[in-house]
Curated annotation (Swiss-Prot):
This is Spermidine export protein MdtJ. GO terms for molecular function: amino-acid betaine transmembrane transporter activity; antiporter activity; choline transmembrane transporter activity; spermidine transmembrane transporter activity. GO terms for biological process: glycine betaine transport. The gene is mdtJ. PANTHER family: SMR FAMILY PROTON-DEPENDENT DRUG EFFLUX TRANSPORTER SUGE, SPERMIDINE EXPORT PROTEIN MDTJ. Keywords: Cell inner membrane, Cell membrane, Membrane, Transmembrane, Transmembrane helix, Transport. It comes from Serratia proteamaculans (strain 568). It comes from the Bacteria. One of its GO terms (cellular component) is plasma membrane. The chain crosses the membrane at residues 1-21, 31-51, 54-74, 81-101. Gene3D superfamilies: 1.10.3730.20. It is found in: Cell inner membrane.
């Protein structure tokens, strides 16, 4: 469970870091750059913690996919970036792809060793 929390934190810090990058580019101040560097670094640290137990393909798909969704949403709301029907279609396709990647990942089964069969044969 803690590894999924790490993944959630990685996603949140990636979103904050990327939005800070945009803010820094339009404001010209150093605050946005500092927040960006700290958040992007934290994002990678949290992602590296998450992939200890979450499958890499799933973690990366969620990290990037959910990040793109929220970054696009906040860019439209806060920075007045345009959004077209084609972008919306792309985001919907992204959501479907993330769901397929997540549902296609299975936990490996534990191998059960029969009792009394632990000796080597020649």
């Amino acid at each position: 469970m803690i590894y999924w929390i790490f993944l959630g934190l990685a996603i949140a810090t990636e979103i904050i870091g990327t939005l800070s990058m945009k803010y820094a580019s339009i404001s010209g101040g150093m605050t946005g750059h500092i927040v960006m560097y700290v958040m992007i670094t934290a994002s990678y640290v949290m992602l590296s913690m998450a992939v200890k137990r979450v499958a890499l393909g799933v973690a990366y798909a969620l990290w990037e996919g959910i990040g793109i969704l929220f970054i696009t949403l906040f860019s439209v709301l806060w920075f007045d970036e345009p959004i077209s029907a084609l972008k919306v279609l792309g985001l919907v396709t992204l959501i479907v792809g993330i769901m397929l990647v997540k549902s296609g990942t299975r936990k490996p089964r534990k191998q059960v060793t029969p009792r009394g069969d632990n000796h080597a044969t020649a």
